[in-house]
Curated annotation (Swiss-Prot):
Cellular component, GO annotation: ribonucleoprotein complex; ribosome
UniProt KW keywords: Ribonucleoprotein, Ribosomal protein
GO BP terms, alphabetized: translation
Molecular function as annotated in GO: structural constituent of ribosome
Family: Belongs to the bacterial ribosomal protein bL34 family.
InterPro entries the UniProt entry points to: Ribosomal_bL34 (IPR000271), Ribosomal_bL34_CS (IPR020939)
Pfam families xref list: Ribosomal_L34
Protein name: Large ribosomal subunit protein bL34
Length: 44
């Protein structure tokens, strides 16, 4: 049985990256929440 986490930088950026977050209304809400919390890293 293979492991569930198969790392890929491209997939990570496309799914969870800054541009992906900015492209949807809910993604922008996530970014705003993380900014309000004071996160150093907003997304992948």
């Amino acid at each position: 049985m293979k492991r569930t986490f198969q790392p890929s930088r491209i997939v990570r950026k496309r799914r969870h990256g800054f541009r992906a977050r900015m492209s949807t209304r809910w993604g922008r809400k996530i970014l705003n929440r993380r900014r309000a919390k004071g996160r150093c890293l907003l997304c992948a």
